[in-house]
Amino acid sequence: MLLIGITGMPGAGKSSAYEIAKKYNLPIVSMGDVVRYETKKRGLELTPENVGNTAIKLREEFGNEAIAVACLKYIEENLKDKEIVIVEGIRSLYEVNYFRKHKPLVLIAIHSSPLTRFERLKKRGREDDSANWEVFVERDLRELGFSIGHAIALADFVVVNEKSFEDCLNQLDNILQEILNNLEKYKKYNFIYETLR
C-alpha cells in the first residue's frame, strides 16, 4: 500500500484532494475529521479555538503522532485491500515519520498565501473557520507550532494554489499521474527525518 499525504496551511486547498480521489476512485482519510470528531466527543462546540486546543491536547495525551496513529489504525482496519490511500491534512513531520515507519508515503504540499487562504476560509464558512484576521493568525501560529512548516518544506511535490480551483486540480492530476506511472518507485518511498527530538 502507498499513502499519498496532503499537507498545507488552513485554506490552502487541501480538500481539493477529494476531487482527485473521486476521479481516480481512491479512498481518502481526513486527519482533520479525526480532530473534529474528538472535539465533539469531548462535548465542545466546533470553533477554531476548541478544535485547535483539542489537537494540542491529543498530542499532549498521546504524543505528537496521536492523530496519525488514529488515521493509520482506521486505514489498516477499513482500507487494507487498497493499493493507494490519500491522507488529507498531515500537520507535522512527526506524523510524516509515523506514517513512513509503517507505510510508504509520498507527501504533497499545497501552498497559498495568507491573504488568499483567509479569503477562502471566510467564504468556506466551516464551523471551525473564522472571518476574523486575528483568529486566523492565531490558528496559523498554532499550526506552525505543530511543525507543519517542516512537513511543507520536505514535501515531495508542491502545488502553488493561487489561481482557480481547476488550476489546482490540474496540478494535482499531473502529480497523481507521475505517481501512478512510477508506482513501484514510490512504494519504496519511506525515508524518515528523525532529527526532531
From Swiss-Prot:
<keyword id="KW-0547">Nucleotide-binding</keyword>
<protein>
    <recommendedName>
        <fullName>UPF0200 protein MJ1399</fullName>
    </recommendedName>
</protein>
<dbReference type="InterPro" id="IPR027417">
    <property type="entry name" value="P-loop_NTPase"/>
</dbReference>
<dbReference type="Pfam" id="PF13207">
    <property type="entry name" value="AAA_17"/>
</dbReference>
<dbReference type="InterPro" id="IPR022970">
    <property type="entry name" value="NTP_hydrolase-rel"/>
</dbReference>
<keyword id="KW-0067">ATP-binding</keyword>
<comment type="similarity">
    <text>Belongs to the UPF0200 family.</text>
</comment>
<feature type="binding site">
    <location>
        <begin position="8"/>
        <end position="15"/>
    </location>
    <ligand>
        <name>ATP</name>
    </ligand>
</feature>
<dbReference type="GO" id="GO:0005524">
    <property type="term" value="F:ATP binding"/>
</dbReference>
